[in-house]
């Protein structure tokens, strides 16, 4: 198990120009989110859902990792067994920065999956049907390898296992509305006092009603690219 968990959300990728459904304008405004991001939408709205994710895939093609992605990648390379990088994001900016073994909790945009046999393949930034009309193994429908709202997220189990056993938690660029990690902090959970997480850092642009920042050892309300050097220094100090 890793000693340090770096957990990131949409905020870390926003500085690279990747918008989220909470942002106004852009691709998300062209669609009703419930029609293309909710459980079951592939059953009754398959073509439009595939079209939307084809556009999202193309949209990230030219997006580049920022300073935060790059610094985290270097740190992961230096301490491969001591650091785990876990992301709520479905983009490939960590991978573009050279970061290996990223746990993408909500799927991976450049990857497709068979709806029956779970065959997966990375198709890069291609349109799904430009690559395959159907699963090459069982000939059933393919889908974006993304966790839709209301679907089970199988990688959550690994997330909770990793965080339950880590010693340092870094949270970057997340509102806490989807996944709130406060419960893992000793200051929140009396049963965890004296064990588990010893030091924690929260880095967001601003306060979130879903996160109790008083639970964290250090809070940095600034851009991830502005905070990352201090975060890296704290991690290095902790590991050494």
Annotate each predicted stretch with a short phrase:
Residues 1-240:
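Conserved catalytic core of sirtuin-type NAD+-dependent deacylases
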